[in-house]
Amino acid sequence: MTQHSTYSAAQAEQSNQEWLRFVALLKQSFDNDLHLPLLTLLLTPDERAALGTRVRIIEELLRGEMSQRELKSELGAGIATITRGSNSLKAAPPELRQWLEQELLQAQR
């Protein structure tokens, strides 16, 4: 292994640990009803809007009534963002997909 790849592996591990720390903190904030102030503190208005758009992308992909190009026009998102959402949804565990369908689609009926 080269020094560069060792550094990259260590950096990836640190990044993963930071992500898991964030997830744990977010869970604790929900348990203490502090999730909205925490997310407002950590995310810019643009980042919050982007997350909302990503949820809409997943929702519409699950619904299956619009093409990716139609989603691009409807949501103002880039085609690459929509394609990543589609690919991620295809790779998602079945139980997550089922839960998302229930939360995003059936909750509206």
From Swiss-Prot:
Residues 68-91 bind DNA. It comes from the Bacteria. The keyword Repressor applies. It is found in: Cytoplasm. The keyword Transcription regulation applies. SUPFAM superfamilies: TrpR-like (SSF48295). InterPro entries: Trp_repress, Trp_repress_bac, Trp_repressor/repl_initiator, TrpR-like_sf. Keywords: Cytoplasm, DNA-binding, Repressor, Transcription, Transcription regulation. Its main location: cytoplasm. GO terms for cellular component: cytoplasm. One of its GO terms (biological process) is negative regulation of DNA-templated transcription. GO terms for molecular function: DNA-binding transcription factor activity; sequence-specific DNA binding. HAMAP family: Trp_repressor. Homodimer. This protein is an aporepressor. When complexed with L-tryptophan it binds the operator region of the trp operon (5'-ACTAGT-'3') and prevents the initiation of transcription. The complex also regulates trp repressor biosynthesis by binding to its regulatory region. Belongs to the TrpR family. This is Trp operon repressor. The gene is trpR.
